[in-house]
């Protein structure tokens, strides 16, 4: 669907969450991270092919059990991982196998990227941006959660 909408220049955006039984509004990437990766793979492929995308991104979750800010940080990290994995897909060989109709080899290119640990890349990017390497630990250590709990009492 994503590739089709991109091709038709009709892709407006995404509201990311995850689901098991219905529109559960669960943490992005918590149930099916491969699906999230495949979405980002199509977006990266389109940009790689020179398309200019104007896509709106939104996280649409209902934080009922987990702490809201922490769950949002988990979602953002899952999105970052999916995007980083999409960036390392070997586009040259993927295209070759697709054109040859070699579905098994094309799928292996995708699964190899998906199964790669991209956290070192993400840590490096965070370091270069001057943001915490571990956002949840940083949030917990900051005292902010306790501060807002007290303010709401």
Label each PLM-derived region with a short phrase.
Residues 1-153:
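Histidine-acidic metal/acid-base catalytic patches
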